[in-house]
A protein has these predicted regions:
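A basic/glycine-biased coupling hinge at the interface between accessory DNA-binding modules
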Residues: 1-156
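Conserved strand-to-helix beginnings and helix N-cap segments that scaffold or border functional pockets
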Residues: 5, 169-170
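SF2 helicase catalytic motif II
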Residues: 150-169
Length: 173
């Protein structure tokens, strides 16, 4: 992002009003200002959990639910939660149905972990990396005044390597 701004400046552009940011850094900035509008209990001073923090919470949840890491590994659950959030799937929308349409033990177990994991993040006023985009999408969808404010803030949005965006990033733009 800084490199892009530097290139624009070298071309003679006035970069004072330009946001050059990753999806995540732009969304953090938006959430720091407006997350309380969601009414979910998050405060603007939220903490962002890294991969190690996420795994620690997942392992705690698994231990408290007596879920063996032989049945499902914490890393696999973390990846499943991340992929779900990339598709804007919240714990209550998470499907436990396997490919054959019947309940799948591993997916049911993952849903239990995902639900408790997310509750713990909310209780700690914490977001994981995937929440940053998912909650910004939710903020814009549920708070039209906030959406309008940010739409009016930007005349143009340029996305580098747009073909690599996931569903949540696509919805955000």
């Amino acid at each position: 992002a800084a490199e892009l701004k530097e290139r624009l400046e070298n071309m003679g552009a006035d970069v004072d009003g330009i946001w050059a940011a990753t999806f995540h850094s732009a969304c953090v900035r938006i959430l720091r200002q407006d997350i309380e509008e969601l009414g979910m209990g998050y405060k603007s001073n939220f903490t962002i959990y890294d991969t190690d923090d996420q795994l620690k919470v997942i392992k705690t949840v698994m231990k408290e639910h007596n879920i063996s890491d032989k049945a499902v590994t914490p890393k696999a659950v973390q990846n499943l939660i991340s992929r779900s959030k990339d598709k804007l799937i919240t714990p209550d929308k998470f499907s436990t149905k396997g490919k054959n349409g019947s309940d799948d033990y591993q997916l049911s177990t993952a849903k239990t972990i995902y639900t408790d994991y997310q509750a713990r993040l909310e209780a700690a006023n914490a977001l994981d990396f995937d929440d940053i985009i998912m909650l910004t999408v939710k903020l814009f969808a549920h708070c039209p005044d906030v959406l309008s404010h940010w739409q009016n803030r930007f005349k143009y949005i340029m996305v580098d390597e747009y073909q690599d965006t996931n569903a949540a990033q696509y919805k955000l733009v």
